[in-house]
């Protein structure tokens, strides 16, 4: 809606019914997949040590395979739509953080600034905290994170930038149809990267389901033996790399837990992008008023335009449900 002139998806639906129907169809397929394995639409409840408490039947997998294959055309058209949108001409290079080789859960992570050699290391919790700093700051309920004292970005754009050659053939093909090239340094391209990933992960789902159908079976989960220990992992969530760590006592009770979400890691980078974007908007408005009356900058950069561009940038990161809405109240202080 941001790029097509609508205030919301609901407003867009009557004007662009085909696009809206494709989006709803893709949402239905993702819901089917999550329900079949995780037990509900979001935040799976069936995961257990060593597997899942609910395993889809062969018949269910065959039905899912049909749904996934049928969704492929919708995903490709959606990616083409996002690749054709008129994104703001704004760039700010940062550090791009993802797992290596397009794995969802893996042993190596990549930090790439595309100005120097990419940094790759084993995804251990100890190494993560040697590299990442956490800081509590005034005026924010979220901690600020940095690599080497600098902000970084995680999520779809980081994954596509770092692992473009590991995309599925069709995902890579639809990406190359667009004028946007990867690595891309505009945060607005994150939404296009997400659309590319729709194609990639439908291809991944097809391969996984086809592999599972002939050998799916229900097996009892292994009996657990409790002991005092700490476990940690890095995995890719849709919004980026998730770090989680748990310390258990001798009875298997969680005594300490540490979770660092992708949105939390992106907060500092969002703020740096906003600062840079505002500087560009103000500079552009100032250039427009050159030689004109003093109040022309105010006319060429109205408050409504500022709010729209700021919200568009925040939504490009897809940080949460609430941030997908129109949320910003902007207070302007005029300096004479």
Name each model feature, range by range.
Residues 1-239, 261-289, 295-336:
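Active-site bordering "gate/hinge" segments
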Residues 249:
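Short, acidic, Ser/Thr-enriched surface-loop or helix-capping motifs
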């Amino acid at each position: 809606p941001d790029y097509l002139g609508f205030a919301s998806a609901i407003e867009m639906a009557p004007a662009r019914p085909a696009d809206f129907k494709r989006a709803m169809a893709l949402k239905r397929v993702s819901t089917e997949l999550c329900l079949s394995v995780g037990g509900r639409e979001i935040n799976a409840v069936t995961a257990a040590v060593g597997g899942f408490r609910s395993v889809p039947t062969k018949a269910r997998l065959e039905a899912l395979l049909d749904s996934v294959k049928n969704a492929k055309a919708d995903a490709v058209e959606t990616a083409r739509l996002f690749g054709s949108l008129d994104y703001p001409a704004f760039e700010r290079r940062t550090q791009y953080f993802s797992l290596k080789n397009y794995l969802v859960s893996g042993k190596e992570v990549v930090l790439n600034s595309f100005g120097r050699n990419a940094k790759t290391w084993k995804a251990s919790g100890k190494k993560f905290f040697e590299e990442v700093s956490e800081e509590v700051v005034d005026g924010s309920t979220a901690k600020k994170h940095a690599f080497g004292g600098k902000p970084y970005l995680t999520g779809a754009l980081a994954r596509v930038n770092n692992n473009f050659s590991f995309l599925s053939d069709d995902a890579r093909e639809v990406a190359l149809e667009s004028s946007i090239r990867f690595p891309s340094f505009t945060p607005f391209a994150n939404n296009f990267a997400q659309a590319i990933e729709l194609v990639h992960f439908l291809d991944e789902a097809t391969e996984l389901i086809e592999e599972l159908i002939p050998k799916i079976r229900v097996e009892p989960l292994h009996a657990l033996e409790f002991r005092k220990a700490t476990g940690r992992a890095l995995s890719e969530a849709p919004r980026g790399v998730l770090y989680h760590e748990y310390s258990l006592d001798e009875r298997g009770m969680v005594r300490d837990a540490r979770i660092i979400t992708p949105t939390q890691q992106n907060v500092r980078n969002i703020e740096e992008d906003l600062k840079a974007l505002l500087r560009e908007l103000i500079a552009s408005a100032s250039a427009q008023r050159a030689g004109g009356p003093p109040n022309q900058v105010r006319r060429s950069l109205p408050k409504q335009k500022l709010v729209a561009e700021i919200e568009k940038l925040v939504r490009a990161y897809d940080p949460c449900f609430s941030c997908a809405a129109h949320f910003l109240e902007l207070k302007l202080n005029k300096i004479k």
